[in-house]
Protein backbone atom coordinates (compact mmCIF):
# COMPACT_ATOMS: atom_id res chain seq x y z
CA UNK A 1 0.00 0.00 0.00
CA UNK A 2 3.03 2.26 0.50
CA UNK A 3 4.85 1.22 -2.64
CA UNK A 4 4.12 3.87 -5.27
CA UNK A 5 6.46 6.84 -5.15
CA UNK A 6 5.32 8.85 -8.15
CA UNK A 7 3.36 11.57 -6.39
CA UNK A 8 2.44 13.55 -9.46
CA UNK A 9 0.28 10.72 -10.77
CA UNK A 10 -1.90 10.78 -7.65
CA UNK A 11 -3.06 14.36 -7.29
CA UNK A 12 -6.68 13.31 -6.97
CA UNK A 13 -7.70 10.08 -5.32
CA UNK A 14 -11.24 8.76 -5.21
CA UNK A 15 -12.39 5.85 -3.02
CA UNK A 16 -13.45 2.73 -4.82
CA UNK A 17 -16.67 2.28 -2.92
CA UNK A 18 -19.27 4.27 -1.08
CA UNK A 19 -19.03 3.61 2.61
CA UNK A 20 -20.63 5.16 5.64
CA UNK A 21 -17.70 5.53 7.96
CA UNK A 22 -19.08 7.14 11.06
CA UNK A 23 -21.10 4.78 13.17
CA UNK A 24 -23.02 6.22 16.08
CA UNK A 25 -21.16 6.04 19.38
CA UNK A 26 -20.12 2.39 19.49
CA UNK A 27 -21.82 1.55 22.73
CA UNK A 28 -23.65 -1.54 23.74
CA UNK A 29 -26.67 0.46 22.67
CA UNK A 30 -25.33 0.56 19.11
CA UNK A 31 -27.65 3.39 18.18
CA UNK A 32 -25.80 6.36 19.54
CA UNK A 33 -28.39 7.25 22.15
CA UNK A 34 -27.20 10.04 24.40
CA UNK A 35 -26.12 8.37 27.62
CA UNK A 36 -26.37 10.05 30.96
CA UNK A 37 -24.54 8.26 33.74
CA UNK A 38 -21.05 6.91 33.97
CA UNK A 39 -22.26 4.23 36.35
CA UNK A 40 -24.30 2.42 33.75
CA UNK A 41 -23.30 0.05 31.00
CA UNK A 42 -24.67 2.15 28.20
CA UNK A 43 -21.85 4.66 28.64
CA UNK A 44 -19.19 1.98 28.42
CA UNK A 45 -15.65 2.87 27.65
CA UNK A 46 -15.00 -0.69 26.62
CA UNK A 47 -17.81 -1.87 24.40
CA UNK A 48 -17.90 -5.48 23.32
CA UNK A 49 -19.16 -4.27 19.98
CA UNK A 50 -16.71 -3.80 17.19
CA UNK A 51 -17.73 -2.20 13.96
CA UNK A 52 -18.83 -4.98 11.67
CA UNK A 53 -18.45 -3.59 8.20
CA UNK A 54 -21.38 -4.78 6.13
CA UNK A 55 -20.82 -5.85 2.56
CA UNK A 56 -21.68 -3.19 0.00
CA UNK A 57 -24.26 -5.55 -1.49
CA UNK A 58 -26.98 -6.10 1.11
CA UNK A 59 -27.88 -9.44 -0.44
CA UNK A 60 -24.56 -10.78 0.81
CA UNK A 61 -25.58 -10.31 4.44
CA UNK A 62 -25.86 -13.93 5.45
CA UNK A 63 -27.76 -15.31 8.40
CA UNK A 64 -24.99 -16.37 10.76
CA UNK A 65 -26.14 -19.96 11.13
CA UNK A 66 -27.16 -20.66 7.55
CA UNK A 67 -24.31 -20.63 5.08
CA UNK A 68 -26.28 -22.37 2.36
CA UNK A 69 -29.25 -20.08 2.16
CA UNK A 70 -30.92 -19.38 -1.12
CA UNK A 71 -29.64 -16.09 -2.53
CA UNK A 72 -32.27 -13.70 -3.84
CA UNK A 73 -30.79 -11.77 -6.74
CA UNK A 74 -30.32 -8.04 -6.24
CA UNK A 75 -31.93 -5.68 -8.72
CA UNK A 76 -30.21 -5.21 -12.03
CA UNK A 77 -30.20 -1.87 -13.89
CA UNK A 78 -33.47 -1.23 -15.66
CA UNK A 79 -35.34 -3.81 -13.61
CA UNK A 80 -38.48 -2.63 -11.86
CA UNK A 81 -38.20 -2.70 -8.08
CA UNK A 82 -41.38 -4.74 -7.86
CA UNK A 83 -39.78 -7.44 -10.04
CA UNK A 84 -37.57 -8.44 -7.10
CA UNK A 85 -39.47 -10.70 -4.76
CA UNK A 86 -39.01 -10.50 -0.99
CA UNK A 87 -41.06 -13.43 0.35
CA UNK A 88 -39.73 -13.22 3.93
CA UNK A 89 -40.50 -9.50 4.14
CA UNK A 90 -43.98 -10.15 2.74
CA UNK A 91 -44.69 -12.78 5.41
CA UNK A 92 -43.72 -10.33 8.14
CA UNK A 93 -45.92 -7.48 6.87
CA UNK A 94 -48.83 -9.90 6.42
CA UNK A 95 -48.16 -11.45 9.83
CA UNK A 96 -48.02 -14.94 8.29
CA UNK A 97 -45.97 -16.70 10.97
CA UNK A 98 -46.64 -20.17 9.53
CA UNK A 99 -45.27 -19.32 6.10
CA UNK A 100 -42.37 -17.44 7.69
CA UNK A 101 -41.46 -20.60 9.62
CA UNK A 102 -41.33 -22.59 6.38
CA UNK A 103 -39.21 -19.99 4.53
CA UNK A 104 -36.78 -19.04 7.25
CA UNK A 105 -34.30 -21.88 6.75
CA UNK A 106 -34.03 -21.53 2.98
CA UNK A 107 -33.91 -17.74 2.59
CA UNK A 108 -31.46 -15.03 3.54
CA UNK A 109 -33.19 -13.37 6.50
CA UNK A 110 -30.57 -10.62 6.57
CA UNK A 111 -31.53 -9.40 3.09
CA UNK A 112 -32.59 -5.76 2.69
CA UNK A 113 -35.59 -4.79 0.58
CA UNK A 114 -35.58 -1.75 -1.72
CA UNK A 115 -36.15 0.51 1.32
CA UNK A 116 -33.15 -0.97 3.11
CA UNK A 117 -35.25 -2.82 5.68
CA UNK A 118 -34.56 -6.39 6.76
CA UNK A 119 -37.45 -8.63 7.84
CA UNK A 120 -36.46 -7.92 11.47
CA UNK A 121 -36.79 -4.17 10.88
CA UNK A 122 -40.35 -4.69 9.64
CA UNK A 123 -41.34 -7.06 12.45
CA UNK A 124 -40.15 -4.58 15.06
CA UNK A 125 -41.76 -1.53 13.39
CA UNK A 126 -45.08 -3.35 13.21
CA UNK A 127 -44.87 -4.71 16.75
CA UNK A 128 -45.12 -8.24 15.35
CA UNK A 129 -43.54 -10.05 18.30
CA UNK A 130 -44.04 -13.58 17.02
CA UNK A 131 -42.23 -12.86 13.76
CA UNK A 132 -39.51 -10.86 15.52
CA UNK A 133 -38.76 -13.60 18.05
CA UNK A 134 -38.70 -16.25 15.32
CA UNK A 135 -36.23 -14.16 13.30
CA UNK A 136 -34.06 -13.57 16.38
CA UNK A 137 -34.10 -17.29 17.14
CA UNK A 138 -32.54 -17.79 13.69
CA UNK A 139 -29.92 -15.09 14.38
CA UNK A 140 -31.27 -12.32 12.15
CA UNK A 141 -28.72 -9.46 12.18
CA UNK A 142 -29.54 -6.76 14.73
CA UNK A 143 -26.91 -4.12 13.95
CA UNK A 144 -27.75 -3.70 10.24
CA UNK A 145 -29.21 -0.31 9.27
CA UNK A 146 -31.94 0.62 6.81
CA UNK A 147 -31.82 3.42 4.21
CA UNK A 148 -32.56 6.03 6.90
CA UNK A 149 -29.71 4.78 9.10
CA UNK A 150 -31.86 3.01 11.73
CA UNK A 151 -31.22 -0.44 13.14
CA UNK A 152 -33.95 -2.80 14.39
CA UNK A 153 -32.97 -1.79 17.94
CA UNK A 154 -33.61 1.88 17.13
CA UNK A 155 -37.03 0.98 15.74
CA UNK A 156 -37.78 -1.10 18.83
CA UNK A 157 -36.99 1.87 21.09
CA UNK A 158 -39.40 3.98 19.04
CA UNK A 159 -42.16 1.35 19.29
CA UNK A 160 -41.56 1.15 23.03
CA UNK A 161 -42.11 -2.53 23.86
CA UNK A 162 -39.69 -3.17 26.72
CA UNK A 163 -39.53 -6.93 26.20
CA UNK A 164 -38.64 -6.50 22.52
CA UNK A 165 -35.95 -3.88 23.26
CA UNK A 166 -34.39 -6.25 25.81
CA UNK A 167 -34.45 -9.22 23.41
CA UNK A 168 -32.78 -7.19 20.64
CA UNK A 169 -30.14 -5.77 22.99
CA UNK A 170 -29.19 -9.26 24.21
CA UNK A 171 -29.02 -10.63 20.66
CA UNK A 172 -26.91 -7.64 19.54
CA UNK A 173 -24.36 -8.37 22.26
CA UNK A 174 -24.33 -12.07 21.47
CA UNK A 175 -23.71 -11.39 17.77
CA UNK A 176 -20.96 -8.90 18.61
CA UNK A 177 -19.19 -11.45 20.84
CA UNK A 178 -19.47 -14.09 18.11
CA UNK A 179 -18.02 -11.67 15.57
CA UNK A 180 -15.02 -10.93 17.81
CA UNK A 181 -14.42 -14.64 18.43
CA UNK A 182 -14.62 -15.39 14.69
CA UNK A 183 -12.03 -12.73 13.90
CA UNK A 184 -9.63 -13.75 16.66
CA UNK A 185 -7.60 -16.49 14.82
CA UNK A 186 -7.06 -14.26 11.77
CA UNK A 187 -6.10 -11.34 13.97
CA UNK A 188 -3.59 -13.35 16.02
CA UNK A 189 -2.01 -14.72 12.84
CA UNK A 190 -1.62 -11.20 11.42
CA UNK A 191 -0.08 -9.91 14.66
CA UNK A 192 2.37 -12.81 14.79
CA UNK A 193 3.60 -12.05 11.26
CA UNK A 194 4.07 -8.36 12.06
CA UNK A 195 7.43 -7.19 13.48
CA UNK A 196 7.71 -5.97 17.07
CA UNK A 197 7.48 -2.18 17.35
CA UNK A 198 6.83 0.96 19.37
CA UNK A 199 4.33 3.50 18.02
CA UNK A 200 3.45 6.88 19.48
CA UNK A 201 0.47 8.92 18.38
CA UNK A 202 -1.17 12.10 19.57
CA UNK A 203 -4.89 12.91 19.73
CA UNK A 204 -6.12 16.49 19.72
CA UNK A 205 -9.90 16.88 19.98
CA UNK A 206 -11.83 19.91 18.70
CA UNK A 207 -15.48 20.90 18.41
CA UNK A 208 -17.42 23.47 16.43
CA UNK A 209 -19.60 23.90 19.54
CA UNK A 210 -17.84 26.88 21.22
CA UNK A 211 -18.58 25.99 24.85
CA UNK A 212 -17.51 22.40 24.31
CA UNK A 213 -14.10 23.18 22.80
CA UNK A 214 -12.55 24.40 26.02
CA UNK A 215 -13.26 21.17 27.93
CA UNK A 216 -12.07 18.74 25.24
CA UNK A 217 -8.96 16.68 25.93
CA UNK A 218 -5.77 15.80 24.10
CA UNK A 219 -3.92 12.54 24.59
CA UNK A 220 -0.51 11.05 23.85
CA UNK A 221 -0.78 7.30 23.31
CA UNK A 222 2.08 4.81 23.35
CA UNK A 223 1.60 1.42 21.73
CA UNK A 224 3.99 -1.50 22.27
CA UNK A 225 3.60 -4.62 20.13
CA UNK A 226 5.54 -7.84 20.68
CA UNK A 227 4.52 -11.22 19.26
CA UNK A 228 0.78 -11.45 19.83
CA UNK A 229 0.80 -9.07 22.78
CA UNK A 230 -0.11 -5.37 22.71
CA UNK A 231 0.11 -2.68 25.36
CA UNK A 232 -1.47 0.76 25.05
CA UNK A 233 -0.58 3.53 27.51
CA UNK A 234 -3.03 6.41 27.54
CA UNK A 235 -4.16 9.28 29.76
CA UNK A 236 -7.68 9.32 28.35
CA UNK A 237 -9.71 6.79 30.31
CA UNK A 238 -13.13 7.50 28.92
CA UNK A 239 -14.33 9.82 26.21
CA UNK A 240 -17.82 10.17 24.79
CA UNK A 241 -19.51 13.14 23.14
CA UNK A 242 -20.61 14.26 26.58
CA UNK A 243 -17.67 13.69 28.91
CA UNK A 244 -14.04 12.75 29.27
CA UNK A 245 -12.23 11.14 32.17
CA UNK A 246 -8.46 11.45 32.64
CA UNK A 247 -5.98 9.15 34.35
CA UNK A 248 -2.87 7.01 33.91
CA UNK A 249 -4.10 3.89 32.21
CA UNK A 250 -2.55 0.86 30.50
CA UNK A 251 -4.52 -1.55 28.37
CA UNK A 252 -2.89 -4.96 27.84
CA UNK A 253 -3.93 -7.58 25.28
CA UNK A 254 -2.38 -11.02 25.78
CA UNK A 255 -2.99 -13.13 22.67
CA UNK A 256 -1.81 -16.34 24.36
CA UNK A 257 -4.47 -16.17 27.08
CA UNK A 258 -8.00 -17.53 26.85
CA UNK A 259 -10.45 -15.02 25.29
CA UNK A 260 -12.01 -14.28 28.69
CA UNK A 261 -8.56 -13.51 30.14
CA UNK A 262 -7.08 -11.64 27.16
CA UNK A 263 -7.85 -8.04 28.12
CA UNK A 264 -6.81 -6.26 31.28
CA UNK A 265 -6.76 -2.59 32.27
CA UNK A 266 -4.23 -1.20 34.74
CA UNK A 267 -4.83 1.94 36.78
CA UNK A 268 -1.22 2.99 37.33
CA UNK A 269 -2.14 5.66 39.89
CA UNK A 270 -4.21 3.39 42.14
CA UNK A 271 -2.05 0.32 41.33
CA UNK A 272 -5.09 -1.84 40.64
CA UNK A 273 -6.22 -3.81 37.60
CA UNK A 274 -9.48 -5.07 36.17
CA UNK A 275 -10.17 -7.71 33.56
CA UNK A 276 -12.54 -6.76 30.76
CA UNK A 277 -15.51 -9.09 30.71
CA UNK A 278 -18.30 -9.34 28.18
CA UNK A 279 -21.06 -10.87 30.27
CA UNK A 280 -23.60 -8.66 31.96
CA UNK A 281 -25.95 -9.13 34.85
CA UNK A 282 -29.72 -9.00 34.49
CA UNK A 283 -29.77 -5.72 36.41
CA UNK A 284 -27.18 -4.11 34.10
CA UNK A 285 -29.22 -5.05 31.03
CA UNK A 286 -32.41 -3.69 32.60
CA UNK A 287 -30.67 -0.41 33.48
CA UNK A 288 -29.42 -0.13 29.93
CA UNK A 289 -32.94 -0.60 28.58
CA UNK A 290 -34.14 2.17 30.92
CA UNK A 291 -31.56 4.55 29.48
CA UNK A 292 -32.42 3.60 25.89
CA UNK A 293 -36.11 4.23 26.53
CA UNK A 294 -35.47 7.67 28.07
CA UNK A 295 -32.88 9.01 25.59
CA UNK A 296 -32.85 10.34 22.03
CA UNK A 297 -32.30 7.75 19.30
CA UNK A 298 -29.32 8.93 17.32
CA UNK A 299 -27.84 7.97 13.97
CA UNK A 300 -24.78 9.51 12.33
CA UNK A 301 -23.06 8.52 9.11
CA UNK A 302 -20.16 10.02 7.22
CA UNK A 303 -21.14 9.79 3.57
CA UNK A 304 -18.24 9.28 1.17
CA UNK A 305 -20.26 9.20 -2.06
CA UNK A 306 -18.48 12.19 -3.58
CA UNK A 307 -15.19 12.18 -1.67
CA UNK A 308 -11.95 13.18 -3.41
CA UNK A 309 -8.41 13.88 -2.24
CA UNK A 310 -6.56 16.80 -3.86
CA UNK A 311 -2.98 17.90 -3.15
CA UNK A 312 -2.87 20.76 -0.64
CA UNK A 313 -1.06 23.85 -1.93
CA UNK A 314 1.42 26.19 -0.26
CA UNK A 315 2.98 29.55 -1.16
CA UNK A 316 1.52 32.97 -2.08
CA UNK A 317 2.89 33.81 -5.52
CA UNK A 318 4.24 30.49 -6.66
CA UNK A 319 1.87 27.74 -5.57
CA UNK A 320 3.30 24.28 -5.10
CA UNK A 321 2.23 20.99 -3.57
CA UNK A 322 2.57 21.00 0.22
CA UNK A 323 5.14 18.52 1.53
CA UNK A 324 6.30 18.80 5.16
CA UNK A 325 7.75 16.71 7.94
CA UNK A 326 5.33 15.16 10.44
CA UNK A 327 7.42 13.91 13.35
CA UNK A 328 10.30 12.06 11.66
CA UNK A 329 8.48 11.45 8.39
CA UNK A 330 8.26 13.47 5.17
CA UNK A 331 4.62 13.65 4.09
CA UNK A 332 2.47 14.85 1.19
CA UNK A 333 -0.56 16.85 2.36
CA UNK A 334 -3.99 16.35 0.79
CA UNK A 335 -7.28 18.17 1.21
CA UNK A 336 -10.22 15.81 1.74
CA UNK A 337 -13.23 17.05 -0.26
CA UNK A 338 -16.85 15.90 -0.30
CA UNK A 339 -17.20 14.30 3.13
CA UNK A 340 -20.69 14.92 4.49
CA UNK A 341 -21.70 14.18 8.07
CA UNK A 342 -25.39 13.28 8.18
CA UNK A 343 -27.03 13.04 11.58
CA UNK A 344 -30.58 12.20 12.63
CA UNK A 345 -32.17 12.41 16.06
CA UNK A 346 -35.51 10.86 17.02
CA UNK A 347 -37.60 11.42 20.13
CA UNK A 348 -41.16 10.27 19.39
CA UNK A 349 -40.85 7.81 22.30
CA UNK A 350 -39.99 10.52 24.87
CA UNK A 351 -42.24 12.50 27.19
CA UNK A 352 -41.93 16.26 27.57
CA UNK A 353 -40.36 15.60 30.98
CA UNK A 354 -37.69 13.35 29.39
CA UNK A 355 -36.80 16.02 26.83
CA UNK A 356 -36.49 18.78 29.44
CA UNK A 357 -34.35 16.60 31.73
CA UNK A 358 -32.04 15.57 28.88
CA UNK A 359 -31.68 19.20 27.80
CA UNK A 360 -30.77 20.30 31.34
CA UNK A 361 -28.08 17.62 31.59
CA UNK A 362 -26.59 18.60 28.22
CA UNK A 363 -26.55 22.30 29.18
CA UNK A 364 -24.80 21.50 32.46
CA UNK A 365 -22.15 19.49 30.62
CA UNK A 366 -21.57 22.15 27.95
CA UNK A 367 -20.78 24.62 30.76
CA UNK A 368 -18.10 22.30 32.11
CA UNK A 369 -20.26 20.33 34.53
CA UNK A 370 -19.10 16.86 35.50
CA UNK A 371 -21.24 13.90 34.51
CA UNK A 372 -20.09 12.13 37.68
CA UNK A 373 -21.84 14.85 39.72
CA UNK A 374 -25.22 14.27 38.07
CA UNK A 375 -27.66 12.71 40.50
CA UNK A 376 -29.68 11.09 37.72
CA UNK A 377 -30.81 7.54 38.39
CA UNK A 378 -32.84 5.84 35.67
CA UNK A 379 -36.44 5.08 36.51
CA UNK A 380 -37.71 1.64 35.48
CA UNK A 381 -39.54 2.41 32.25
CA UNK A 382 -42.74 0.56 31.41
CA UNK A 383 -43.64 -0.30 27.81
CA UNK A 384 -45.27 2.53 25.87
CA UNK A 385 -48.81 2.36 24.56
CA UNK A 386 -48.44 0.82 21.08
CA UNK A 387 -48.97 3.08 18.05
CA UNK A 388 -52.19 2.59 16.02
CA UNK A 389 -52.26 -0.71 14.07
CA UNK A 390 -50.66 -0.66 10.63
CA UNK A 391 -53.05 -0.26 7.69
CA UNK A 392 -50.47 -0.29 4.88
CA UNK A 393 -50.63 -3.32 2.60
CA UNK A 394 -47.63 -5.27 1.33
CA UNK A 395 -48.29 -4.01 -2.19
CA UNK A 396 -48.36 -0.36 -1.07
CA UNK A 397 -45.16 -0.81 0.90
CA UNK A 398 -43.06 -2.63 -1.69
CA UNK A 399 -44.19 -0.53 -4.68
CA UNK A 400 -43.37 2.79 -2.96
CA UNK A 401 -40.58 4.84 -4.48
CA UNK A 402 -37.11 4.13 -3.11
CA UNK A 403 -36.33 6.48 -0.25
CA UNK A 404 -40.04 7.21 0.27
CA UNK A 405 -41.20 4.10 2.11
CA UNK A 406 -44.56 4.42 3.88
CA UNK A 407 -43.86 4.93 7.57
CA UNK A 408 -44.55 1.93 9.78
CA UNK A 409 -44.79 2.20 13.55
CA UNK A 410 -45.00 5.25 15.81
CA UNK A 411 -45.28 8.64 14.09
CA UNK A 412 -41.79 10.05 13.63
CA UNK A 413 -40.42 13.04 15.51
CA UNK A 414 -37.07 13.43 13.79
CA UNK A 415 -34.50 16.20 13.28
CA UNK A 416 -31.98 15.88 10.45
CA UNK A 417 -28.74 17.75 9.99
CA UNK A 418 -26.07 17.71 7.27
CA UNK A 419 -22.64 19.20 7.69
CA UNK A 420 -19.73 19.22 5.25
CA UNK A 421 -16.68 17.84 7.02
CA UNK A 422 -13.47 19.63 6.07
CA UNK A 423 -10.32 17.64 6.62
CA UNK A 424 -6.63 17.37 5.80
CA UNK A 425 -4.59 14.18 5.56
CA UNK A 426 -0.81 13.82 5.35
CA UNK A 427 0.50 10.68 3.63
CA UNK A 428 4.11 9.53 4.05
CA UNK A 429 5.98 7.09 1.82
CA UNK A 430 8.69 6.80 4.51
CA UNK A 431 6.59 5.34 7.32
CA UNK A 432 7.72 1.72 7.98
CA UNK A 433 4.25 0.35 8.80
CA UNK A 434 1.57 -0.47 6.24
CA UNK A 435 -2.06 0.54 6.70
CA UNK A 436 -3.19 -3.11 6.78
CA UNK A 437 -0.87 -3.74 9.75
CA UNK A 438 -2.20 -0.65 11.51
CA UNK A 439 -5.77 -1.89 11.00
CA UNK A 440 -4.95 -5.17 12.74
CA UNK A 441 -3.47 -3.35 15.74
CA UNK A 442 -6.42 -0.95 15.88
CA UNK A 443 -8.84 -3.86 15.78
CA UNK A 444 -7.33 -5.18 19.01
CA UNK A 445 -7.71 -1.83 20.78
CA UNK A 446 -11.09 -1.06 19.18
CA UNK A 447 -12.80 -1.16 22.61
CA UNK A 448 -11.49 2.41 22.90
CA UNK A 449 -14.19 4.15 20.92
CA UNK A 450 -12.03 6.93 19.45
CA UNK A 451 -9.57 4.31 18.16
CA UNK A 452 -12.48 2.55 16.49
CA UNK A 453 -13.26 5.77 14.60
CA UNK A 454 -9.64 5.95 13.42
CA UNK A 455 -9.84 2.34 12.23
CA UNK A 456 -13.03 3.03 10.27
CA UNK A 457 -11.57 6.12 8.63
CA UNK A 458 -8.30 4.56 7.41
CA UNK A 459 -10.25 1.72 5.80
CA UNK A 460 -11.09 4.18 3.02
CA UNK A 461 -9.06 4.07 -0.18
CA UNK A 462 -6.51 6.74 0.73
CA UNK A 463 -3.80 8.38 -1.40
CA UNK A 464 -0.50 6.43 -1.54
CA UNK A 465 1.54 6.16 1.64
CA UNK A 466 0.72 5.95 5.35
CA UNK A 467 -1.59 8.53 7.03
CA UNK A 468 0.85 10.12 9.52
CA UNK A 469 -1.55 12.99 10.25
CA UNK A 470 -5.29 13.10 9.65
CA UNK A 471 -8.52 14.74 10.77
CA UNK A 472 -11.34 12.35 11.66
CA UNK A 473 -14.89 12.84 12.96
CA UNK A 474 -15.22 11.10 16.33
CA UNK A 475 -18.71 12.23 17.31
CA UNK A 476 -21.23 14.40 15.47
CA UNK A 477 -19.91 17.63 17.03
CA UNK A 478 -16.33 16.55 17.72
CA UNK A 479 -13.34 15.95 15.46
CA UNK A 480 -9.85 14.74 16.25
CA UNK A 481 -6.48 15.41 14.66
CA UNK A 482 -4.40 12.24 14.95
CA UNK A 483 -0.62 12.50 14.50
CA UNK A 484 1.72 9.51 14.30
CA UNK A 485 4.80 11.06 15.87
CA UNK A 486 7.21 8.19 16.38
CA UNK A 487 7.75 4.63 15.17
CA UNK A 488 10.60 2.16 15.55
CA UNK A 489 11.04 -1.59 15.51
CA UNK A 490 12.49 -3.18 18.64
CA UNK A 491 12.17 -5.75 21.40
CA UNK A 492 10.77 -5.11 24.84
CA UNK A 493 10.91 -6.64 28.30
CA UNK A 494 8.19 -9.23 28.87
CA UNK A 495 7.23 -7.34 32.03
CA UNK A 496 5.66 -4.61 29.87
CA UNK A 497 2.89 -7.06 28.92
CA UNK A 498 2.23 -8.49 32.40
CA UNK A 499 0.40 -7.22 35.48
CA UNK A 500 2.92 -5.88 38.06
CA UNK A 501 3.15 -7.97 41.24
CA UNK A 502 2.19 -5.07 43.51
CA UNK A 503 -1.08 -4.38 41.64
CA UNK A 504 -4.28 -5.68 43.23
CA UNK A 505 -7.35 -6.83 41.32
CA UNK A 506 -10.34 -4.52 41.68
CA UNK A 507 -13.29 -5.78 39.59
CA UNK A 508 -15.22 -2.57 40.29
CA UNK A 509 -12.45 -0.04 39.49
CA UNK A 510 -14.04 0.78 36.14
CA UNK A 511 -17.81 0.44 36.70
CA UNK A 512 -18.51 0.77 32.97
CA UNK A 513 -16.20 -2.06 31.97
UniProtKB/Swiss-Prot annotation:
GO term, biological process aspect, one? protein retention in ER lumen
**Which UniProt keywords are listed?**
ANK repeat, Chaperone, Endoplasmic reticulum, Membrane, Repeat
Check the record and name the InterPro entries matching this protein: ANKRD13, ANKRD13_C, Ankyrin_rpt, Ankyrin_rpt-contain_sf
Classification via Pfam families? Ank_2, ANKRD13_C
Chain positions of ANK repeats: 83-114, 115-144, 148-177
Gene3D superfamilies under this entry?
Ankyrin repeat-containing domain
Give the highest taxon in the source lineage. Eukaryota
GO cellular component, as recorded: cytoplasm; endoplasmic reticulum membrane
Q: Where is the composition biased (Acidic residues)?
A: 20-29
Q: Where is this region: Disordered?
A: 1-34, 55-77
Q: Where in the cell is it found?
A: Endoplasmic reticulum membrane
Basic and acidic residues compositional bias, start-end: 1-19
Please provide, alphabetically and separated by semicolons, the GO molecular function terms listed in this UniProt record.
signaling receptor binding
Q: What is its main location?
A: endoplasmic reticulum
- What's its job? Acts as a molecular chaperone for G protein-coupled receptors, regulating their biogenesis and exit from the ER.
Q: What is this protein called?
A: Ankyrin repeat domain-containing protein 13C-B
Lineage here is: Eukaryota, Metazoa, Chordata, Craniata, Vertebrata
Amino acid sequence: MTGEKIRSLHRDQKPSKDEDLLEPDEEATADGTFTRTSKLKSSKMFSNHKVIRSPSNPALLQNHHHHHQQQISPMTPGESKTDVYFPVHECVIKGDIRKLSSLIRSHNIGQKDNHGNTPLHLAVMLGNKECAHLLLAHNAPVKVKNAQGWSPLAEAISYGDRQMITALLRKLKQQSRESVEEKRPRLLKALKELGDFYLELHWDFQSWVPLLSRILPSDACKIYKQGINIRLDTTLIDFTDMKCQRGDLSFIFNGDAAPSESFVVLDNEQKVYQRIHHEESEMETEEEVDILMSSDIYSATLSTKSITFSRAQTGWLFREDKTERVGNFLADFYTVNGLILESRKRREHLTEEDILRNKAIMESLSKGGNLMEQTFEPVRRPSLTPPPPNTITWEEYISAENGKAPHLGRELVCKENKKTFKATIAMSQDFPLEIESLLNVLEVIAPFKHFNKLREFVQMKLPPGFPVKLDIPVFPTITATVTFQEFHYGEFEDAIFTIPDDYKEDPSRFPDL
